[in-house]
């Protein structure tokens, strides 16, 4: 190992002081902040909110201080369909309802994983991975499908937000305390020679305590409910004693098994045209595992465009914090110019960023439009976020095509847009990725 010498540091001082530009940038950044000082005008000019395909202008939702983006994105895709089908002015499905059942199922999932790894040392990487974050707010498309198919959905007016759903930090803090404590109890039981029946009985005791905690913090979810609404033509409709499952079937009416997850992960360990799953990633025990097919970016975008041309929005996962202006709602690789202003060259490619932990999937949103050039190629994309209407253009963002190439990792599209070869690859036995793989990161944050 080589230490930093005084002579070397003196040289760095001299080189910096010899460049007058650095002094000007220093003054700008220390007074205004880094990103505001190097933001480009051109990124705003190029990324206006006009799109050749524009599917919705519905009001945006707001996940507030929670990590429920994946739920919001899925429920938003349903919401647009429901507003259109039933001629509604506006409408939201309850994100808190899905949140409750996700917490409940994730608790059981975690405890079952603890039982399954009870023969491993407490310091093993997998056990440590489980205990570091027993559960959290994040998730994946296949996980939210499992929740919808088991528990249905309800209108937001039937099961509204609570303090804990809108700001989940305290909820998670104490739920994870209960789960870590439960993990110790179960591991100690198994180490002491308890049989499977005794372990499962204890797990059920723990889950009763957890269920009570969730009901007291989020509210007890309805088993059935009444619901009434008026459409844009002032026609009155109502439902009495409908279950969440029946509401999903009647008002959403989608066969979720018709949809598949497509990823773009150009790393050496994930060849294109293959299917993948992630070990230990899930929420509902017994539900189908999370599954993706990895495809090149050109094909990835082609599928997203095809679905929007057919009139349907697209759930997608990305690394939203990368080179983005949250307030203006601009996602563009040229939004900040580090090279011209600071002589800093950020040259790492998409594969390198994934391999070296610089990027991963952090946020799910909805593609609701795209601007195509004369050749049918995408120029920029309309993005429905779930951060409320005070950012972007009333909550909608715009992503440049280059940003999509570099920082988008997943879309969900109908199976019938895939070729027979692609569908066969998706349905083949998947390669199992490590629990900490970046393609599972959306569900572990």
Where in this protein do the model-derived segments appear?
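Bimodal feature
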Residues: 2-22, 72-75, 88, 405-406, ...
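N-terminal regions that are enriched for targeting/export leaders
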Residues: 2-58
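Active-site nucleophile-adjacent alpha helix/oxyanion-hole segment immediately C-terminal to the catalytic cysteine
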Residues: 44-314, 391-394, 401, 409
């Amino acid at each position: 190992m080589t230490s930093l010498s005084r002579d070397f540091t003196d040289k760095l001082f001299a080189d910096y002081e010899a460049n007058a530009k650095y002094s000007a940038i220093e003054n700008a950044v220390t007074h205004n902040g880094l990103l505001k000082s190097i933001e480009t005008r051109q990124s705003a000019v190029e990324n206006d909110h006009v799109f050749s395909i524009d599917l919705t202008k519905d009001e945006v939702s707001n996940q507030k201080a929670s990590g429920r983006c994946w739920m919001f994105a899925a429920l938003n895709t349903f919401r647009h369909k429901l507003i259109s089908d039933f001629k509604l002015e506006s409408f939201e499905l309850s994100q808190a309802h899905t949140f409750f059942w996700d917490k409940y199922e994730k608790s059981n999932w975690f405890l079952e994983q603890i039982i399954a790894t009870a023969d491993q040392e407490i310091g093993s990487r997998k056990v440590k991975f489980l205990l570091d974050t027993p559960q959290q707010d994040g998730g994946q498309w296949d996980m939210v499908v499992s929740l919808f198919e088991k528990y249905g959905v309800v209108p937001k007016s039937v099961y509204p937000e609570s303090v804990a759903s809108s700001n989940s930090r305290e909820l998670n803090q104490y739920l994870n305390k209960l789960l870590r404590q439960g993990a110790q109890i179960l591991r100690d039981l198994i180490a002491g020679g308890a049989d499977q029946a005794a372990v499962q009985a204890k797990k059920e005791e723990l889950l009763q305590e957890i269920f009570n905690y969730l009901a007291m913090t989020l509210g007890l979810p309805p088993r059935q409910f009444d619901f009434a609404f008026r459409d844009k033509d002032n026609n009155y409709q109502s439902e009495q004693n409908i279950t969440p499952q029946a509401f999903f079937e009647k008002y959403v009416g989608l066969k979720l098994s018709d949809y598949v997850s497509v990823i773009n992960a150009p790393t050496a360990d994930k060849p294109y045209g293959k299917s993948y799953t992630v070990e230990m990633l899930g929420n509902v025990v017994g539900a189908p595992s999370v599954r993706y097919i990895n495809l090149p970016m050109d094909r990835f975008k082609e599928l997203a465009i095809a679905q929007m041309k057919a009139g349907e929005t697209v759930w997608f996962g990305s690394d939203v914090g990368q080179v983005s202006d949250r307030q203006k709602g601009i996602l563009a690789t040229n939004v900040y110019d580090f090279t011209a202003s600071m002589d800093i060259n950020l040259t790492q490619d998409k594969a390198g960023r994934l391999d070296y932990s610089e990027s991963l999937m952090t946020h799910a949103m909805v593609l609701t439009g795209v601007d195509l050039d004369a050749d049918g190629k995408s120029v920029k994309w309309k993005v429905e976020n779930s951060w409320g209407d005070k950012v972007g253009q009333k909550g909608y963002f715009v992503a440049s095509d280059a940003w999509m190439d570099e920082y988008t990792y997943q879309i969900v599209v109908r199976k019938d847009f895939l070729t027979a070869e692609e569908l066969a690859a998706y349905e083949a036995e998947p390669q199992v990725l490590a629990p900490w793989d970046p393609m599972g990161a959306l569900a572990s944050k």
